[in-house]
Amino acid sequence: MSRFFANGSDSESESSEEEVQAPNFNKASAFQFSDDEEEVKRVVRSTKEKRYENLTSIIKTIRNHKKIKDIPNTLSSFEDLTRAYTKALPVISKEENGITPRFYIRCLAELEDFINEIWEDREGRRNLSKNNTKSLGTLRQKVRKYIKDFEEDLSRFREAPDQESEAEDEEAHVSDAGEAADDSYAGFKKEASVTAPKIAKSAPAKSVPADDEDSDDSIDWDSDSESETESSEDENQYQNMRERFLKRSTEKGEDKGDDDKRKDKRKEQKLKIRKRAEDDEDGEWETVVKGHVVEKPKMFEKDAEIDIPLVLAKLVEIMSARGKKRTDRRLQIDLLFELRDISDQHNLGVPVSVKIHFNIISAIFDYNQKISEPMKMEHWALLLEVMQSMMKLLLANADISISESVAEEHEEYITAPYYIRGCPLAAVERLDDEFTKLLKECDPHSNDYVSRLKDEMNVVKTIELVLQYFEQCGNPNERCRIYLRKIEHLYYKFDPEVLKKKRGELPATTATSVDVMDKLCKFIYAKDDTDRIRTRAILAHIYHHAMHDNWFQARDLVLMSHLQDNIDAADPATRILYNRMMANLGLCAFRQENVKDAHHCLVDLMVTGKPKELLAQGLLPQRQHERSAEQEKIEKQRQMPFHMHINLELLECVYLVSAMLLEIPYIAAHEFDARRRMISKTFYQQLRSSERQSLVGPPESMREHVVAAAKAMRCGNWQACANFIVNKKMNTKVWDLFYESDRVREMLVKFIKEESLRTYLFTYSNVYTSISIPSLAQMYELPVPKVHSIISKMIINEELMASLDDPSETVVMHRSEPSRLQALAMQFVDKVTNLVDVNEKVFDMKQGNFFQRGNMGNRGDRGYNRNQNNQGGNWGGQRRDNRNQRNRNQRGHHKNQQQQQQQQVQTIDEE
């Protein structure tokens, strides 16, 4: 309607006439074929344009999918993109000399960053649906595999992304490739080509200073009016509908010229802005920041006399804002540092400086509002520095006493002895907890974790300073608390000097970590009056002994402390430490050749199937639906840092090997025992599942190696068993993780030989009448005295029915045990007897005594008896007597059946 009223006519009649005259065009002409049709040229696009247009459209689709995090569609679009790029390779090699287009490299880089961002966000990844999670893993693998061919291009792109110029290049590619498609509506082409330069003119004008605002407004108004007139001209131009939608040949030269003009104008505007900024820097001009400027509050007046009461009053004023809603916590820390500098400049004394230090520590702790989240690294470094500085001041001045038992009104800063209210022990405990949170927050496989772990030296140094202070002026309870903090940083660390000292390579006076642990733990045993600190100290002490192969000391501590009786009543952190202690104790027993004890230590952890959770080394994703978000958050806070983890595969391997060395000889000894018990349920299940498989390939995983070794041991083949347990793959995965791994491997081979010998004797004792001891020693590569000792133990324990003939060095087998056929027959008789008994009981329960009466319950007899009883007047008593007689007959019949069955069993045994 705007074009009819554009002239602003004075009378309504004129406007109505214009409205009537406007549609005077012949309607049929809109569908007529133009005589000039031959002059209209169709657009012929090159192969490059088609391929590039296809690539850019797919890239645009991928970006849209990334915005809404639609991972399955992103995956399908990425596959389409790779196929489209493969089709475009001939064009790229011909037109671009084999150089991959920048916009394609940009797309790959953005896609890689997008995947890494989602993958590192563990919280968000857990909340993804099953389809998104599966698609994310597939997309990540495909992208990582695909971009290997573009590593050099990606590295060059990441070094100099050139975002602005790259965007322009991409726009140019898109415009070149899709020029014909965009011009399909020829009526809008002219409008776009006319208005684009005017928008480009008006856009830079916004960056010009305020003096040119009026001119900018006038330019904008002119452009609006011009665009309206152009649109009306375009609508009047295309009188033929077919002509309107015909594709025309594009004037690429003019469009490129317009693009070059736009780029030149943008560069000119940027140069002008840079020159003005340089001119401003030369002068005294300052850039005004939007919003009001908050001035930093003044500490003291100019003429104020700085003394201790004034500084303390200012300190109270600053700390009074602590915990309030609108408090600027960063400004509060800055003010406290400034106050400390003022105190040092005016020599107000060490007590005032210590008090300010302590308040700075409290302010840094308050900076992070969420306790569950770690603090920033800049605050962490500042906290360590201030904490160590305060403790050095306290150690250098013995007349300063800082304690939480000192009331604020009793603080003394002027005359010695000085008394300050505060608790450095609570501060160092909080610092230690913050360090643990920092470690748990970052990726354990990154360099960031290693750099943060280096701060443990500073944390331990700070704990040492606090420990020295409380050894001078602390009570026993405070010393126990700080001793426990030092123990928790020491108990899991291996000290090779302990084993060297055992072997005599170091003098006996050398101080080791075991001596330090003994000193700290014994003080806690004697002085602590809380069960928790003493319990944790005992657990850490046992762990440290077990780590350094002090098996008997660790075992005695466990037995004397009776921890296993009351550990269920302890807090979760203590129970986690108990589980860690039992795991390490089992590894120690295994290294010291106590296979049975190792199995007993590890069975409670491994039989549950979730040692990862019990050791606080991660959460199982299968049980995610069983816990709420709050429970998951609490469990994450209890997790151990990565450098304190125990290798779960090593733990499981030790448990399975120990179970194999115990279970296989036991199975061979009780092969026909129906009441045979399982020593290890987990190992038994692994063995049975392998036996149920119709086709078993060569072992690959650790479990498959142990199961294959167990099958070889059942046949007495110790060499195959040893090869399955000790090989290159198992050494890399498990055995090389042990200290002195060669000694552990030798111990394993020795145990495999001995248990294979026992299994062989159990399995084939019914085949031999006698067997030579030297031949057994040669078969299993064991010394003859060792073989003699093993067989003697088996005979003494009544495991093997045989006798030793020393002159001939043979083992004479006794035929006291039933043969295989006899054992199977006895099992069959037992099962048949049980089946008969069960069937009789079921029959009696269902039918009662009805079918056991005379004549199968004949009604005529019962009527006759009833008439006789009625005549005698004692019908009820006679019925009771008959029932009792029938019951006696049944019991006698059942006894006769049992006697007959026993006789049958005896005859079978005699045969």
UniProtKB/Swiss-Prot annotation:
Keyword Cytoplasm in annotation: yes
Modified residues (Phosphoserine): S34, S165, S175, S184
Keywords recorded for this protein, A-Z: Cytoplasm, Initiation factor, Phosphoprotein, Protein biosynthesis
InterPro entries the UniProt entry points to: EIF3C (IPR027516), EIF3C_N_dom (IPR008905), PCI_dom (IPR000717), WH_DNA-bd_sf (IPR036390)
Membership in a protein family: Belongs to the eIF-3 subunit C family.
Complexes and interactors: Component of the eukaryotic translation initiation factor 3 (eIF-3) complex. The eIF-3 complex interacts with pix.
Function: Component of the eukaryotic translation initiation factor 3 (eIF-3) complex, which is involved in protein synthesis of a specialized repertoire of mRNAs and, together with other initiation factors, stimulates binding of mRNA and methionyl-tRNAi to the 40S ribosome. The eIF-3 complex specifically targets and initiates translation of a subset of mRNAs involved in cell proliferation.
Main location: cytoplasm
GO BP field: formation of cytoplasmic translation initiation complex
Residues covered by the PCI domain: 642-818
Ranges of compositional bias, category Low complexity: 196-208, 897-911
UniProt name for this protein: Eukaryotic translation initiation factor 3 subunit C
Compositional bias ranges of the Acidic residues kind: 11-20, 162-171, 210-236
GO molecular function, one term: RNA binding
Biased composition annotated in UniProt, kind: Polar residues: 23-32
Source organism, top-level taxon: Eukaryota
Listed Basic and acidic residues bias regions: 241-271
Annotated HAMAP family: eIF3c
Residue numbers spanned by region Disordered: 1-38, 155-181, 196-284, 851-911
Entries under PANTHER family matching the protein: EUKARYOTIC TRANSLATION INITATION FACTOR 3, SUBUNIT 8 EIF3S8 -RELATED, EUKARYOTIC TRANSLATION INITIATION FACTOR 3 SUBUNIT C-RELATED
SUPFAM superfamilies from the UniProt entry: Winged helix' DNA-binding domain (SSF46785)
Comp. bias regions, Basic residues: 885-896
